[in-house]
């Protein structure tokens, strides 16, 4: 947001210099990102003075040049060669002396005046045309001044050229109230008043507003009060299109707006003055003399000011005549209804549009205008009538118009102040410093915050509705601190905090640990969109369609919901690569998943229905180990992925023997299991079902793991590295074949083994699984290998046999297992 220092001083009476103003604005939260000195005429015409042509003779060696003597107020006339056809004795002109730098046409290209000889005659300056000075476009001849112009007067003084300072304020999205010169002046005045200065904001006087006649009545009808809570309008007739005055053009250029004509410039001027967007319609183009605020039928074509035809939706608020749409409300005008060179009668629109409606429409059409920027953040709902009066009076003054109607103001449900309580104790607690109560009251008064009641150190306050960023106690305390001054809160010399903290798992460190391990083992990280297709979730039980978080204004049907699982993103990546003959894949992805649960929603806390989880997905497909001269190719399998999962969990310090592993019945997988620790599910792993693969056109088997990374972080234990002396005594290996029911898992047997022989059992592994006709129905065979070791002595056969008998007995008692002969 560009703020002109000269323009700002129209509304606040202060002797502060531009640099001091910029410093204060930064201190109170309106960060100044740029500061630049500017001139209404580039270069300020330094070295250009008023001159009087004393003599004008023909050049001895040219039929179109003149040799002149010019009085520039120094007492010694200058000889200057001039080729202008209107050069003559007695003329008052603007003369550029030697050394002057001009910027012809107001551009960036310099032109320096030098002592020179023109066809043998010395010339000590230049008599200037308008375009050479950068103050106009005419080059028909030298610029003629009135006869009363005094020779020697600097062009800067004669033309009243002023220096200005451009202050570029980086507005945060919540401070739309400061998106105008009045808004910035209001903040500056609050700062000065809180420090005892008698300063107030001088609002432009609109008391002279009164209709000159009632010849141009326009009826206004609002059909959608939700989208347009307030709509005001007034007409001005018999306007004359002309350039706006120099002072207004200078203001607009400082704000970054190119002047166009007086009517358009007035609406832009009021926008940057008051922060209220206006729209001026050519009243002659309003059919039926009626303005209707409504939506149009889906697909209605509409041509905007840029000449582009756009298809409207039923959710786009439009400003219409009795017959057709004329303007996209709060966003962009129409090509056939705006101000043109033939306009004489004007309808001025001044409205408050619902920010949500404007934001959705602006995003839908990809339009970002000065008006939509303000409307979608929330303009002052009490400024509309004032702004309409201001614009109408300016059109009367600068375009010779006649105010031809009363102001029509449709405002059925006035927007009230934001009301809440704030306590002095809470102010001190949040700021970290005691601020005297009188200082707080002074700041609140300076911010135009009304104190409705005070009791037991608690203030009941009313905040003006133009401060859309201050709607609760914490917001107001931030505003108090902003005006009080961040730099006035001292940094304490001592930190009141314990120096010992309970160690907490670092999610980022664990992410890096997982990523390093997976990447080192041939996996490739992918990154996919959090938005996905709603069709993926239709008919699923694992992730129901009604639990999707839906986007209100999706970019396309393919990106209409937030993902509940990373599975579909992973399958899209597999399908994309497989179609390009890259079917051997090992992939992983970190990402958030999003959920909606209507049962958790309440009027007091509607956001409780929404939740998200951070997850890690891993997938393998195709060949896991490629062939080489000494290795046969190995296809990816469920066990390939399970091995990766267990190694990853070990790296996180999780005892995999403490995991509870259960079979998972899911419509996502043809076979799967879950791993949980202390009742908290950590991951699901399985073979993706054919039905799911068919949805995405994936033909090959995909083995997939999805880990709840947040649960994993909470389950992680810090590694304690303990050095142990290597055992001097040998290990003993024993194998055992067990006949068990099909539902018995190796994990269950392993848990029983370690619970039975904690002292001697070093490890247990599964090296064979057999199911076939030679076994009873419902049975399978596990071949287990046990490593036994005693750190204090060499195991004898008696101790080994006793340990194996204990294991066999517990397997039979707890798992129904029998030793195979």
Identify the residue ranges that each predicted region occupies.
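Phosphate-backbone binding interfaces of nucleic-acid-interacting proteins
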Residues: 1-212, 347, 366, 370, ...
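Conserved mixed alpha/beta core segments that line enzyme active sites in large multi-domain catalysts
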Residues: 49-80, 152, 249-250, 267-336
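Extended, well-folded interaction surfaces typified by the phenylalanyl-tRNA synthetase beta subunit core
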Residues: 420-585, 734, 787-791, 799-821
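Glycine/proline-enriched, intrinsically flexible loops and inter-domain linkers
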Residues: 5, 23, 27-28, 40, ...
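Terminal amphipathic helices with adjacent charged low-complexity linkers/tails
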Residues: 188, 192-222, 399-427, 433-434, ...
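Mobile "lid/hinge" segments at catalytic clefts and subdomain interfaces of large enzymes
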Residues: 119-134, 138-144, 155-165, 169, ...
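A carboxyl-terminal module marker
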Residues: 2, 442-452, 469, 473, ...
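Class II aminoacyl-tRNA synthetase-like tRNA-binding/catalytic domains
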Residues: 116, 292-332, 336-339, 495-612, ...
């Amino acid at each position: 947001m560009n703020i002109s220092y000269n323009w700002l001083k129209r509304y606040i009476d202060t002797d502060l210099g531009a640099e001091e103003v910029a410093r204060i604005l930064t201190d109170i939260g309106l960060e100044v990102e740029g500061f630049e000195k500017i001139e209404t005429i580039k270069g300020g015409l330094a070295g250009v003075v008023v001159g009087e042509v004393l003599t004008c003779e023909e050049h001895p060696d040219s039929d179109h040049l003149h040799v002149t003597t010019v009085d520039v107020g120094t007492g010694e006339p200058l000889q200057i060669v001039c080729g202008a056809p209107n050069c003559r004795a007695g003329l008052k002109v603007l003369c550029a002396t030697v050394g002057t730098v001009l910027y012809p046409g107001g551009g960036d290209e310099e032109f320096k005046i030098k002592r020179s000889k023109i066809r043998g005659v010395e010339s000590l300056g230049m008599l200037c045309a308008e375009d050479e000075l950068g103050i106009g476009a005419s080059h028909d001849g030298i610029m003629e001044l009135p006869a009363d112009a005094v020779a020697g007067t600097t062009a800067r003084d004669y033309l009243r050229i002023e220096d200005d300072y451009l202050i570029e304020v980086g507005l945060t999205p919540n401070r739309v109230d400061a998106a105008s010169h009045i808004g910035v002046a209001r903040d500056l005045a609050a700062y000065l008043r809180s420090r005892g200065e008698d300063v107030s904001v001088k609002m432009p006087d609109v008391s002279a507003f009164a209709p000159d006649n009632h010849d141009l009545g326009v009826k206004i009808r609002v059909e959608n009060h939700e989208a347009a809570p307030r709509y005001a309008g007034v007409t001005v007739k018999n306007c004359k299109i002309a350039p706006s005055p120099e002072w207004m053009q200078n203001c607009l250029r400082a704000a970054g707006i190119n002047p166009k004509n007086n009517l358009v410039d007035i609406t832009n001027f009021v926008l940057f003055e008051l922060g209220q967007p206006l729209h001026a319609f050519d009243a002659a183009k309003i059919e039926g003399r009626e303005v209707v605020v409504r939506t149009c039928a889906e697909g209605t074509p509409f041509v905007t000011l840029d000449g582009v035809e756009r298809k409207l939706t039923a959710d786009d608020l439009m400003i219409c005549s009795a017959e057709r749409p004329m303007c996209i409300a709060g966003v962009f005008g129409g090509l056939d209804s705006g101000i043109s060179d033939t306009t004489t009668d004007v309808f001025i629109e001044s409205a408050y549009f619902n920010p949500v409606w404007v934001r959705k429409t602006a995003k839908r059409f990809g339009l970002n205008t000065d008006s939509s920027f303000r409307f979608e953040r929330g303009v002052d709902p009490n400024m509309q009538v004032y702004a309409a009066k201001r614009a109408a009076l300016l059109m009367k003054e600068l375009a010779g118009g006649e105010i031809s109607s009363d102001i029509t103001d449709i405002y059925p449900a006035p927007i009230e102040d934001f009301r809440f309580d704030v306590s002095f104790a809470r102010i001190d607690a949040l700021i970290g410093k005691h601020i005297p109560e009188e200082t707080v009251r002074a700041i609140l008064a300076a911010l135009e915050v009304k104190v409705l009641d005070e009791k037991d150190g608690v203030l009941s306050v009313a905040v003006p509705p133009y401060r859309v960023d201050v709607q609760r106690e914490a917001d107001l305390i931030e505003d108090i601190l902003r005006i009080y001054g961040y730099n006035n809160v001292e940094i304490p010399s001592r930190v009141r905090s314990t120096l010992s903290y309970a160690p907490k798992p670092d999610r980022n460190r664990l992410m890096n640990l997982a990523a390093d391990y997976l990447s080192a083992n041939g996996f490739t990280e992918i990154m996919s969109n959090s938005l996905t297709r709603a069709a993926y979730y239709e008919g699923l039980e694992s992730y129901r369609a009604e639990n999707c978080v839906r986007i209100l204004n999706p970019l396309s049907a393919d990106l209409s919901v937030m993902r509940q699982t990373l599975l579909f993103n992973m399958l899209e990546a597999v399908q994309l690569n497989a179609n390009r003959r890259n079917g051997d894949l090992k992939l992983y992805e970190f990402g958030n998943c999003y959920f909606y649960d209507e049962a958790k929603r309440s009027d007091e806390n509607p956001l409780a229905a929404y939740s998200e989880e951070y997850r890690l997905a891993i997938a393998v497909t195709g060949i896991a180990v490629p062939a080489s001269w000494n290795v046969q190719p190995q296809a990816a399998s469920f066990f390939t992925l399970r091995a990766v999962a267990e190694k990853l969990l070990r790296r996180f310090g999780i005892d995999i023997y403490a995991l509870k592993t259960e079979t998972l019945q899911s419509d996502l997988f043809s076979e799967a299991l879950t791993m949980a620790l202390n009742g908290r599910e950590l991951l699901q792993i399985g073979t993706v079902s054919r039905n799911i693969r068919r949805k995405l056109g994936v033909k090959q088997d995909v083995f997939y793991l999805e880990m709840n990374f947040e649960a994993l972080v909470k389950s992680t234990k810090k590694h304690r590295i303990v050095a142990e002396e290597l055992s001097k005594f040998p290990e003993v290996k024993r194998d055992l074949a067990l006949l068990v029911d099909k539902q018995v898992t190796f994990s269950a047997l392993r848990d029983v083994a370690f619970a039975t022989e904690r002292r001697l059992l070093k490890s247990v592994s599964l090296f064979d699984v057999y199911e076939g006709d030679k076994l009873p129905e419902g049975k399978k065979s596990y071949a287990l290998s046990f490593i036994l070791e005693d750190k204090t002595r060499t195991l004898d056969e008696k101790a080994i046999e006793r340990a194996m008998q204990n294991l066999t007995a517990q397997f039979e008692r707890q798992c129904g297992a029998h030793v195979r002969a």
